[in-house]
From Swiss-Prot:
SUPFAM superfamilies: Nucleic acid-binding proteins. GO terms for cellular component: cytosol. This is Translation initiation factor IF-1. GO terms for molecular function: ribosome binding; rRNA binding; translation initiation factor activity. One of the essential components for the initiation of protein synthesis. Stabilizes the binding of IF-2 and IF-3 on the 30S subunit to which N-formylmethionyl-tRNA(fMet) subsequently binds. Helps modulate mRNA selection, yielding the 30S pre-initiation complex (PIC). Upon addition of the 50S ribosomal subunit IF-1, IF-2 and IF-3 are released leaving the mature 70S translation initiation complex. Keywords: Cytoplasm, Initiation factor, Protein biosynthesis, RNA-binding, rRNA-binding. It comes from Ruthia magnifica subsp. Calyptogena magnifica. Gene3D superfamilies: Nucleic acid-binding proteins. NCBIfam families: infA. It is found in: Cytoplasm. HAMAP family: IF_1. Component of the 30S ribosomal translation pre-initiation complex which assembles on the 30S ribosome in the order IF-2 and IF-3, IF-1 and N-formylmethionyl-tRNA(fMet); mRNA recruitment can occur at any time during PIC assembly. Residues 1-72 form the S1-like domain.
Length: 72
């Protein structure tokens, strides 16, 4: 899948789960499970409940995603 096939949405982290998985509430009200991307993991960027994030999702599974950016 190319980069353009992914859906990017913004949301707020609601809960931190084990193994760097987070519950994220999207702007449209849906809640998804999201893990952090490799670049965020590599640079030790901390993500806490309440942070605003950008999530990348595949059109095939709209219940899971990847956190690709943490807004300031």
């Amino acid at each position: 899948m190319s980069k353009s096939d992914y859906i990017e949405l913004e949301g707020v982290v609601k809960e931190k789960l084990p193994n760097t998985i987070f519950t994220v509430e999207l702007e449209n009200g849906h809640r998804i499970l999201a893990h952090i991307s490799g670049k965020i993991r590599k640079h030790y960027i901390r993500i806490l409940p309440g942070d605003k994030v950008t999530v990348e999702m595949t059109p095939y599974d709209l219940t899971k995603g990847r956190i690709i950016f943490r807004h300031k």
